């Protein structure tokens, strides 16, 4: 291992102590290939000594080999995993089988060999599978961390003004909870929340990030000169070790419908590092559920499925797949936004208490429903949104994804019924929503609705992992039939009002048509929000 500058040594030592799978490098390594296993004959693998670059990966350690004389070009890349064969050879050498290559690594010092051996052993002989690994398919975890390793995806979240500004306001508005405190940032991503904690006066922030975004977070920490405040630790919170308990945990663990991606379980798991009476930001989440009526949305999905009802598509009969096509389209939750007036009853609220709920509580979430119907119509399904609260010592701050609040990158979610039900004002709609966690970091969502006092019911099971992103950016339209005045008369009344305001400009030479001045008219409110 090359002799590091004092600050580099400090960084590596801290990382090694906190997370054995952290990034590290070893220089001056001579790599030999085993030419004959029986005679133990070796040949030099590369001309000249090499540097081994080790970096954390969700599946183990990525080992990249470069020449000491040319670190720009990677000669070979391997994955050190739990099934990697390896053994110590003397005080400075280490034998390892990577893919089909049998290698002997001779290190520059005894210490380097010991450190590398610890890195390998921490992958090979780790503790049993972490809670995260037990509940998550390998392919799902790989895709998940790859997705959040892109700067573009971090940018998408950071540019959500409502999200980012609300977090900053909640943290800075409760500086007393952060001043001189130890903070844990779970799933830190770019580290933006860690920076907010430092702005609020935090003494130390441990920023945990399992994707490759950790390296970018480290760059931001160093370029902003806060490396003495923020320690970026690559890894999963379920697998890393911290040197101390923390006063506050911050995170942005919410997914679509609050629970998607199952990051909330990771957030709750992090409480093992929280001191008694410590703070959680956010503190609790409310999932809101309401029946809705939207003939346009239902018809859109139904007509898509009818593609498979063609009996002569280029001479081919597709009708045998119509039933499966219909099932697939209606298994998709719809991610978009809507006018809250499509909701037929006041929403039911299901609370998740981040300070007290257990991880297991989120494996099967059974939510009883009872709605007093406020308007007669056809119920096409259930609409979902969530609010989270930051309960601070100085003030409480809410982040809302309600259709009545400014739009966020979470939008809202709607689950359709394949068989809608007609229901009258004053009737009671009962049922349940069952969220059953799966190993794809999501949930199977079952909705079951029944009109009390009748035999009328409808149900559906949807795959929250496979939503339909319907949002187009177009303004939300008011539901049909909500105008209580003539929209035409409303328009012309507003035109007349604007015309009066612009009369002075016409007298000063402004052009007018039919008595309307050339001044700008704002008719959006009248069209989009009729009274």
From Swiss-Prot:
GO (cellular component) term, any one: nucleus
InterPro entries assigned: Arg_MeTrfase, PH-like_dom_sf, PRMT_dom, SAM-dependent_MTases_sf
Primary localisation category: cytoplasm
Superkingdom in the source lineage: Eukaryota
GO terms classed as biological process: chromatin remodeling; peptidyl-arginine methylation, to asymmetrical-dimethyl arginine; positive regulation of ecdysone receptor signaling pathway; positive regulation of transcription by RNA polymerase II; regulation of DNA-templated transcription
Gene3D superfamilies with a match to the protein in the record: Hnrnp arginine n-methyltransferase1, Pleckstrin-homology domain (PH domain)/Phosphotyrosine-binding domain (PTB), Vaccinia Virus protein VP39
PTM per Swiss-Prot/TrEMBL: The dimethylated protein is the major form.
Sequence ranges assigned to domain SAM-dependent MTase PRMT-type in this UniProt record: 141-450
Residues at which S-adenosyl-L-methionine binds: 154, 163, 187, 209, 238, 266
Keywords: Chromatin regulator, Cytoplasm, Methylation, Methyltransferase, Nucleus, S-adenosyl-L-methionine, Transcription, Transcription regulation, Transferase
GO molecular function: histone H3R17 methyltransferase activity; histone H3R2 methyltransferase activity; histone H3R26 methyltransferase activity; protein-arginine omega-N asymmetric methyltransferase activity; protein-arginine omega-N monomethyltransferase activity
Catalytic activity of the protein: L-arginyl-[protein] + 2 S-adenosyl-L-methionine = N(omega),N(omega)-dimethyl-L-arginyl-[protein] + 2 S-adenosyl-L-homocysteine + 2 H(+)
One Pfam family here: PRMT_C
Localization (cell): Cytoplasm; Nucleus
Cytoplasm in keyword set: yes
Asymmetric dimethylarginine PTM positions: 501
EC number of the protein: 2.1.1.319
Entry similarity comment: Belongs to the class I-like SAM-binding methyltransferase superfamily. Protein arginine N-methyltransferase family.
Function: Methylates (mono- and asymmetric dimethylation) the guanidino nitrogens of arginyl residues in proteins. May methylate histone H3 at 'Arg-17' and activate transcription via chromatin remodeling.
Record PANTHER family: HISTONE-ARGININE METHYLTRANSFERASE CARMER-RELATED (PTHR11006:SF10), PROTEIN ARGININE N-METHYLTRANSFERASE (PTHR11006)
Self-association state and partner proteins as the record states: Homodimer.
Protein name as catalogued: Histone-arginine methyltransferase CARMER
Source organism per UniProt: Drosophila persimilis (Fruit fly)
Source taxonomy: Eukaryota, Metazoa, Ecdysozoa, Arthropoda, Hexapoda
